[in-house]
């Protein structure tokens, strides 16, 4: 790899790449600075005028479940440096960065992870053929001939590949189709979450950045949706640079790559990844510098806006009226001929899978609560309620239980419309709807938790509790139906605008865009940071099509299509104090209503013995994990930190992989004294491990008493890369709190 990079990315070429990157970044950041003032004004105006969607009926979780481990298990990873497959212990913490450890013992002994993968911008592939097609398209002229050795050989029939158009790729495989399905759901959840990297609560910086991206691309005649608007600001900015830099680099270096087609493909992936990392570091520095400059200027800008808000609004409305008079006749004709006829079909294509997905969310929530209620009646009663509710609180973050909801969006197609409206991919809309589904599920669960916690304060009997659970479920479902309708209608409006506005702007550009500079003289110089002609022009275009979009969504609601409420229907708040309940301390179900020591069978004395107490602590630790497919690896042999076990020969069959896995487990652990029951908790060593002092980033390790559960921050998906962050051998390892079940057993809800 080093030879490839030193040959094709020498100092002169790196300098050339840095200069081109600098030019692109400088041009984009001018757009960002312009949009920052507009976004700040819009945000402050919104606060003062109080405009916004109707108040939601469901509560939302203000304190996220940030101590949860989403998933953990074993999988095989292909090591590109030695071309071997290695078994890795992997987990996904609450921040959705895939963390890969050498093995489970390394994780338990707090050895730094091998890698932390930020999956923003990646695609999850389940077929080597799919992957080879994408790789072949990325570098024309390198398609392998029939019968030749491909770039990747998978030893099983169940691969999972993380593919990125610019960054390095990751190769995994599983032993069974069931494992592949589980990991696919988990990795898709990681991608979905990491793609949504700009915080929702960023009311100024976020909108300014996305508007700047759109304006910059439109200045390059690139309209329509952009599939690589993925990740945080620096990742998106890196994608933007690579979109321009990549083709020229490919044309320059592609013909110089030597070897067979698959070898040239491998070389190009290495080069592209190296360039992407260079671009990322440069983009990060530039973006942070500009952001700091804008934040320093923000107080002065806010003072001007507060003082002159009315004058700024008047000036903007005057400008809008002049632009409207100029473009309205052309815009209305364009809307009538090219957009209006297609709005119903676009809306129908969006409504069917989206509404099916939200209905599935409702059904899954209903089933989980009903099953819990039956368990309360038939098994544990109030004593087990804490355990049941601890699991229910994690429902929205359970990749497999939510998968049936997310899958409803997969059939979304805009056949015949994608080319007309320049929609490069429907993945933008799929992921947005799926994120809404997860949010609404969590809101429903949290509202149910809050109402049930209030009911428990009355000290109900088991029978009264079951009736209360059913009554609360019905109340929450009514609130869910209302909020679901509001969220879907807003999603439909936004999606229709996202599809039609770029198309209209592109259609109107030849006759209108060149005339816009003459409107600049209508803006007072003092207000020029808060009013831009280009933005006002886009708002006027939006208004010309907005009435047709609103009418189409309204008609769908009037027809009661897909269970949408009419705009005139307002659900009166039957719980006036409900939102006050959400202001309290987050509910810890395990602590407040957990099992007091009687696990439902056998003798239980007055106070638990030390082993029982340890088991209880372990149970509570396990309750904080959403799901697991962890192999049993109890530690029994001494473990040498930082020693890489010798790599075995590359296995080419399932049998060899099974043998490799068995060898790893024997080397890392002694066999349990007796077979573990299905789903039984695995006893883990509670002995604290001495870790030598090291450099940041991790916080100093405290000495903990034996048996004390450690609950510190897990590794975060690094924003300094496109894919992987490898911890240095000397750095202090992050510590996790997790729970694992016996071999191959998923944590049951």
From Swiss-Prot:
The modification Phosphoserine is found at residues 568, 574, 607, 628, 647, 650, 669, 674, 685, 695, 699. Keywords: Cell junction, Cytoplasm, Lipoprotein, Membrane, Myristate, Phosphoprotein. Its main location: cytoplasm. SUPFAM superfamilies: PH domain-like. Residues 68-192 form the PH domain. Coiled coil: none annotated. A lipid is attached at residue 2 (N-myristoyl glycine). One of its GO terms (biological process) is negative regulation of apoptotic process. It comes from the Eukaryota. One of its GO terms (molecular function) is transcription coactivator activity. GO terms for cellular component: adherens junction; cytosol; plasma membrane. Belongs to the Niban family. May play a role in apoptosis suppression. This is Protein Niban 2. It comes from Mus musculus. The gene is Niban2.
């Amino acid at each position: 790899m080093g030879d490839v990079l030193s040959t094709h990315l020498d100092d002169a070429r790196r300098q050339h790449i840095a200069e081109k990157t600098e030019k692109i970044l400088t041009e984009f950041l001018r757009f960002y600075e312009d949009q920052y003032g507009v976004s700040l004004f819009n945000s402050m105006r919104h606060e003062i005028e109080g405009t916004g969607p109707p108040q939601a009926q469901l509560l939302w979780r203000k304190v996220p479940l940030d101590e949860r481990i989403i998933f953990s298990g074993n999988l095989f990873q292909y090591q590109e440096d030695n071309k071997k497959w290695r078994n890795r212990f992997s987990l996904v913490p609450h921040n959705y960065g895939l963390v890969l450890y050498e093995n489970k013992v390394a994780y338990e002994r707090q050895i730094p992870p091998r890698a932390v993968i930020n999956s923003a911008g990646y695609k999850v592939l389940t077929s080597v053929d799919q992957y080879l097609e994408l790789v072949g398209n990325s570098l024309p002229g390198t398609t392998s001939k029939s019968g030749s050795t491909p770039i990747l050989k998978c030893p099983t029939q169940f691969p999972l590949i993380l593919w990125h158009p610019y960054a390095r790729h990751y190769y995994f495989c599983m032993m069974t189709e069931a494992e592949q399905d589980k990991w696919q759901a988990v990795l898709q959840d990681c991608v979905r979450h990491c793609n949504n990297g700009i915080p929702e609560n960023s009311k100024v910086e976020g909108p300014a950045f996305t508007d700047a991206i759109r304006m910059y691309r439109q200045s390059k005649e690139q309209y329509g949706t952009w599939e690589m608007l993925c990740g945080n600001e620096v990742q998106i900015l890196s994608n933007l640079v690579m979109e321009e830099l990549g083709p020229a680099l490919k044309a320059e270096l592609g013909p110089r790559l030597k070897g067979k087609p698959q070898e040239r493909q491998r070389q190009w992936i290495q080069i592209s990844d190296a360039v992407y990392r260079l671009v990322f570091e440069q983009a990060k520095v530039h973006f942070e510098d500009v952001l700091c400059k804008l934040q320093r200027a923000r107080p002065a800008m806010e003072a001007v806006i507060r003082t002159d808000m009315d004058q700024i609004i008047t000036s903007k409305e005057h400008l809008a009226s002049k632009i409207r008079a100029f473009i309205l006749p052309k815009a209305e004709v364009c809307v009538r001929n090219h957009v209006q006829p297609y709005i119903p079909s676009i809306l129908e294509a969006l409504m069917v899978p989206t509404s099916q997905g939200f209905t599935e969310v409702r059904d899954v929530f209903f089933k989980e609560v009903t099953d819990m209620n039956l368990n309360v009646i038939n098994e544990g009663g109030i004593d087990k309620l804490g355990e049941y509710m601890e699991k229910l609180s994690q429902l929205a973050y359970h990749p497999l239980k939510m998968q049936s909801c997310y899958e409803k969006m997969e059939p979304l197609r805009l056949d015949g419309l994608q080319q007309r409206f320049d929609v490069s991919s429907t993945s933008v809309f799929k992921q947005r709807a799926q994120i809404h589904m997860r949010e609404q599920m969590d809101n429903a669960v949290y509202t149910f938790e809050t109402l049930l916690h209030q009911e428990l304060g009355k000290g109900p009997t088991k029978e009264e509790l079951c009736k209360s659970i059913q009554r609360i479920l019905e109340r929450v479902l009514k609130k869910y139906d209302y909020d679901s309708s509001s969220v879907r209608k807003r999603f439909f409006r936004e999606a229709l605008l996202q599809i039609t506005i770029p198309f209209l702007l592109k259609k109107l550009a030849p006759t209108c865009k060149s005339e816009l500079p003459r409107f600049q003289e209508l803006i007072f110089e003092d207000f020029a940071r808060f009013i831009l002609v280009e933005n006002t022009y886009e708002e006027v275009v939006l208004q010309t099509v907005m009435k047709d979009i609103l009418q189409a969504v309204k008609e769908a609601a009037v027809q009661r299509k897909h269970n949408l409420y009419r705009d005139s229907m307002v659900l009166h708040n039957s719980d006036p104090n409900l939102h006050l309940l959400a202001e309290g301390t987050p509910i810890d179900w395990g602590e407040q209503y957990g099992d007091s020591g009687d696990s439902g069978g056998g003798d239980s004395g007055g106070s638990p013995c030390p082993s029982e107490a340890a088991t209880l602590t372990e149970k509570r630790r396990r309750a904080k994990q959403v799901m697991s497919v962890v192999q049993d690896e109890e530690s029994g042999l001494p473990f040498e930190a930082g020693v890489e076990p010798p790599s075995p020969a590359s296995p080419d069959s399932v049998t060899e992989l099974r043998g490799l896995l068995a060898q790893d487990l024997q080397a890392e652990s002694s066999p349990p004294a007796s077979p573990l029951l299905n789903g039984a908790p695995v006893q883990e060593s509670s002995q604290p491990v001495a870790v030598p002092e090291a450099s940041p980033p991790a916080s100093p390790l405290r000495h903990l008493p034996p048996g004390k559960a450690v609950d510190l921050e897990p590794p975060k998906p690094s924003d300094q890369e496109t894919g992987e962050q490898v911890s240095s051998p000397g750095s202090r390892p992050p510590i996790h709190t997790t729970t694992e079940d016996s071999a191959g057993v998923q944590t049951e809800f």
